[in-house]
Amino acid sequence: QWHPALHHDMASPFRWLIGGPTRRLSPWAQVVKHDLERARRVDMIAAYFSPGRGMLKRIARAAKREGARLLLPAKSDNGATVAAARLLYGPLLRRGVEIAEYQPCKLHMKLLVIDDAVFVGSANFDMRSLFLNLEVMLRIEDADFARDVRGFIAREIEESRIIDFAEYRKSRSLLTLVQQAISYLLVGVLDYTVTRRLNFRNPDAD
């Protein structure tokens, strides 16, 4: 099916992608979905990470091919978003996705590399950015640039804490699981300014 987000000048490595309120995936998210369907490798830095099941499965499939790495925040001005992301760690870790939490400071960067394509711009990798928020992203398809960006992500991961699956499982109490599940639901439907006020007190996310 033709969609303007998926059809462009093939001679140009640059594509501007727009997202906005839609009943389905926004145009920029449709391009990401299209690229993830056949992705061999995925590397991502995201301030907010709470996508739906379909996107999670695509990332996990890439992990089975050549690999998938996620660099996510350990600290945030919106602790509910940190809790929402942590709810998803288990299924991803079981499928071979590497996850690290950035330690030096709060993480606001949005950066995604899928094979030879780099996405940079305003969009997080959560339900609001995929379906609702007005977003502007630039997609750059260049193998050398993608390799350089992956090197940058690797250096940032050196400043981060690698999430170990066994330790992650031990740290999940029933209360923690409930808090994370509620956070995931809230950040998917409520504006970020609202979820900031609804934060569960989590000193690790401050």
Descriptions of predicted regions:
Residues 1-206:
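Charged, low-complexity intrinsically disordered terminal segments
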